Amino acid sequence: MNQAAQTVATISAEALRQTARNTHALPEDARWRVDDVAALFALPFNDLLFRAQQVHRENFDANTVQLSTLLSIKTGGCEEDCGYCPQSAHHDAGVKAEKLMELDEVLEAARAAKANGATRFCMGAAWRSPKDRHLEPVMDMVREVKAMGLETCVTLGMLKAEQAQQLKDAGLDYYNHNLDTSPEFYGKIITTRTYQDRLDTIGHVRDAGINVCCGGIVGMGESREARAGLIAQLANMDPYPESVPINNLVQVEGTPLAGTEALDPFEFVRTIAVARITMPGAMVRLSAGREAMDEALQALCFMAGANSIFYGEKLLTTGNPQADRDRALLARLDIRAEGYAG
């Protein structure tokens, strides 16, 4: 472990779980109680998909998806110990720490993404939280990418209120900060950042007037109840996130979650469907893990209400289907890419 990683105080997993249970229990009058969400998960598969597709059609064109591209603008060396992440300095996953990319490199990637049909460009940096000196070059990236006509999103770790406002002033459209999992399961995955830390950052983003991109990861060994708990936390935000990425764990050798039993594919589709029903107006994004999904499974995810995919060869440090394969699949399903005449 490097010195940067050692500077972060580690909270015991049990303390995190206890705090999460006490602090983040949903009120009795919550819009979606965990039991209600769990009842959706328990519906017969066809009934659940039928209901999700109905909700989807009431809010979106069911045959259109948004293509998003995600670029790692600062890779590796992160001080956090997220058990799924190869970019953590706590894990020996073979990811080298790199410095922040230059503006010209980022703009070249953004131009290529737009030429390939993406209408949304996301930039991720492996920081616990950005230092103020890091923010100015990121704001330059946001301004220049936005000037290309692309929707902008960044994920930089925890933010202070004033940093969120600076990003808003730079024209940022979305800020991504995932909850990852339910409050109860959280301490088994991360011990260097509390659930409340995540909620505080989301609050700063919302207060600054930036759209919230917030979702989670499934397939980390959690129970169905934990998946229901994650969705309930998201759906009870006021308002719920405009953008909800659902990731299927990509297991990377050298991370603590390597070797975790894989999630049943139909359970992943159920998670997409439940997200669509509980957050009807959100963009539900089919995110990490798509490379391991066959075309039939991806088609079921679209039926369940997913209306965005991450597009390009890499998602931060993990693989993703080739753009040509994605275009061919969408064409076979008669699904149009938003804003792309291809």
Curated annotation (Swiss-Prot):
Binds 1 [4Fe-4S] cluster. The cluster is coordinated with 3 cysteines and an exchangeable S-adenosyl-L-methionine. Binds 1 [2Fe-2S] cluster. The cluster is coordinated with 3 cysteines and 1 arginine. It catalyses: (4R,5S)-dethiobiotin + (sulfur carrier)-SH + 2 reduced [2Fe-2S]-[ferredoxin] + 2 S-adenosyl-L-methionine = (sulfur carrier)-H + biotin + 2 5'-deoxyadenosine + 2 L-methionine + 2 oxidized [2Fe-2S]-[ferredoxin]. Its EC number is 2.8.1.6. It is an enzyme of class 2 (transferase). One of its GO terms (biological process) is biotin biosynthetic process. It comes from the Bacteria. Keywords: 2Fe-2S, 4Fe-4S, Biotin biosynthesis, Iron, Iron-sulfur, Metal-binding, S-adenosyl-L-methionine, Transferase. The keyword 4Fe-4S applies. Residues 63-290 form the Radical SAM core domain. Pathway: Cofactor biosynthesis; biotin biosynthesis; biotin from 7,8-diaminononanoate: step 2/2. [2Fe-2S] cluster binds at C122, C153, C213, R285. GO terms for molecular function: 2 iron, 2 sulfur cluster binding; 4 iron, 4 sulfur cluster binding; biotin synthase activity; iron ion binding. [4Fe-4S] cluster binds at C78, C82, C85. Its cofactor is [4Fe-4S] cluster; [2Fe-2S] cluster. SMART domains: BATS (SM00876), Elp3 (SM00729). Homodimer. Belongs to the radical SAM superfamily. Biotin synthase family. PANTHER family: BIOTIN SYNTHASE, BIOTIN SYNTHASE, MITOCHONDRIAL. Catalyzes the conversion of dethiobiotin (DTB) to biotin by the insertion of a sulfur atom into dethiobiotin via a radical-based mechanism. This is Biotin synthase. It comes from Cupriavidus pinatubonensis (strain JMP 134 / LMG 1197). The gene is bioB.
